Amino acid sequence: MEKLVTQQVQNVDPKQSEILNISEIPAENPTETPIISKQKLLEAGVYFGHKASQWHPKMAQFLLKKKRNETHIIDVLKTQKMLEIAYKLVEKFAQKGAKFIFVGTKKQAKKVIEEQAVRTNSIYVSGRWLGGTLTNNRTILSRLKTMENLEKQAAENFQGYTKKEKLAKQKQLAKLQKNLNGIKGLKDVPLFSLIMLVADPLKDAIAVKEARKKGIKIIGITDSNVDPSLVDFGIPANDDSTKSITLIFTVLADAIASAKGGKKLFAYQSDENIILPEDPEKELKQTRYRNNSFEKFARQKNTLKESQVLKPNTEIQA
């Protein structure tokens, strides 16, 4: 444990090392259980990138040189290493008293964002990001105050109001709760102590931009089409799969829980103890289509051996 993470992962951007003090975090002992096994990462589909035409050149170091059906494949070994570092960063920040805001407004991220934020007593945004959440704090705090007042009135069944007024207030409260429930705790957290964990920096570009403006550190998933410089520390992985996002965000939440003496659900657990959600049918069809396309392409071009064809629960040969 004497080596440093910067010695373990040569591809870490110097900017990331400087901003997040990676050099202070001890590297994993290679004889220990990996944070997540390579097999589990493959099962989660973290290796699926986007079409080569959509890639971002700064992600080149995290991609396999050979493309499949003109689609980039993310190197799962580098995903594993970067996830390990991200875990230790989050754990370290949590130990120092940092607070976290989970952000994931795309369909595939909503459920895990809410579950893991609630589990770790963190702030979250899984619905629409309200412009100014971080940069126009006064307006957001004012809305939170309004919501709190309405909740108090609701507890008393809106006593003193007519039926029509009650319905109007109930409707107003429901709308505020839908947009603000996840950020209730924002009023008690100084922004300088926040760390943002984001599922898709492109989908939630406004949130990322506001965090940047306020000097909030950002850790997020960086798919093959994402500029990794959008975040302070990126985890190269598929950001369009429910399984992939669930795996990564549960591990990050494990880091927060561990710092507080809580239980780890996925991090450093055996494969049989890691149960991933079933992908929605649309996602499943897309995954099967990609796998079939990769297999057909490989056989036509003779670029892969049969054992290297991408199938569920098989390893990728770099």
Swiss-Prot record:
Disulfide bridge partners, by residue number: none
CDD domains to which the protein is assigned, alphabetical: RPS2
GO molecular function: structural constituent of ribosome
GO biological process: translation
Keyword annotations from UniProtKB, A to Z: Ribonucleoprotein, Ribosomal protein
A GO cellular component entry from the record: cytosolic small ribosomal subunit
Keyword Nucleotide-binding tagged: no
Record's keyword annotation contains Ribosomal protein: yes
UniProt feature coiled coil, ranges: none
A Pfam cross-reference name: Ribosomal_S2
Domain of life from the UniProt record: Bacteria
Family indicated by similarity: Belongs to the universal ribosomal protein uS2 family.
HAMAP family on file: Ribosomal_uS2_B
Protein name per UniProt: Small ribosomal subunit protein uS2
Species this chain originates from: Mesomycoplasma hyopneumoniae (strain J / ATCC 25934 / NCTC 10110) (Mycoplasma hyopneumoniae)
Source organism phylogeny: Bacteria, Bacillati, Mycoplasmatota, Mycoplasmoidales, Metamycoplasmataceae
Recorded name of the encoding gene: rpsB
